[in-house]
Design a protein with these regions (language model features):
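RNase H catalytic domain
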Residues: 5-18, 55-123, 127, 132, ...
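A short, polar/acidic, helix/strand-boundary loop motif
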Residues: 31-49
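Short, flexible loop/turn segments with low-complexity composition
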Residues: 137-141
């Protein structure tokens, strides 16, 4: 069966501190095609960046009827998206994520061990770190 496979990751240098460089990345794969999306921010947290990566991935999928599997090394994101954790913090992003999720016919969230031998997870990790460094450099001028 055809499915879209997504890997997401975050980076937060000096996590949550004002002026910290942060980044997110997502890698979408479907029928041999691969697309990487990423971005950066200042002063965010690793959790918010991971959530942003998932949100950007979901928003970029145009055909919401194709089954999707989202792999993340964030237990916080995976368990909350699967309904096992309460949405106490970051409610603004959780609302956006849940609204976007409702548009899909089939979407699963799967935890993957980070900083291990999974090439796709390592790819998004490298990209998220690069984005956090780029955001920090841009801020410092």
């Amino acid at each position: 069966m055809d499915k879209i496979t997504v890997y997401t990751d975050d980076s937060a240098l000096s996590n949550g501190r004002p002026g910290s460089g942060c980044g997110w990345a997502c890698k979408l794969m479907y029928k041999g095609q691969v697309r990487m999306k990423s971005g950066g921010a200042i002063g965010e947290t690793n959790n918010r960046m991971e959530m942003q990566a998932v949100l950007e991935a979901m928003k970029s999928i145009t055909d919401k009827t194709i089954p999707v599997e989202v792999y993340s090394d964030s237990n916080y994101v995976v368990e909350t998206m699967n309904g096992h954790f309460a949405m106490k913090k970051n409610r603004d992003l959780w609302r956006k994520l849940m609204r976007e999720r409702q548009k899909f016919t089939s979407i699963r969230f799967i935890w993957v061990k980070g900083h291990d031998k999974n090439q796709h997870n390592n790819d998004v990790d490298r990209q998220a770190v690069a984005e956090s460094r780029k955001a920090l450099e841009a801020q410092q001028g």
